[in-house]
Amino acid sequence: MSSAPEPPTFKKEPPKEKDFQSPGLRGVRTTTLFRAVNPELFIKPNKPVMAFGLVTLSLCVAYIGYLHATQENKKDLYEAIDSEGHSYMRRKTSKWD
């Protein structure tokens, strides 16, 4: 019975210290101009500020949706005055209905 030869084992060399100064883009060599133009790539994320921005943006979108909904409701109403002088809101009707 012949046994299959064992595959050669490759030794993984530990990474050199000078190769990995820090993970991600902070360790990449770049110019000062690139870092000045793109600071968000090199600054640690600030989670409270991100949460505040997400809540603010969500509230703005909700407010725009609210304004759109109320504008749609107001578009079909007008103020009518009856023969006695009382005013009331009335929905517009088409002449074709």
Curated annotation (Swiss-Prot):
Keyword field: Membrane, Transmembrane, Transmembrane helix
Location of the region described as Disordered in the Swiss-Prot/TrEMBL record: 1-24
Residue ranges that the Swiss-Prot or TrEMBL entry lists as coiled coil: none
Cited PANTHER family: SMALL INTEGRAL MEMBRANE PROTEIN 8
Gene giving rise to this polypeptide: SMIM8
Protein name: Small integral membrane protein 8
Basic and acidic residues bias spans: 9-20
InterPro entries: UPF0708
Species name: Pongo abelii
Chief localisation class: membrane
Family designation: Belongs to the SMIM8 family.
Transmembrane segments: 48-67
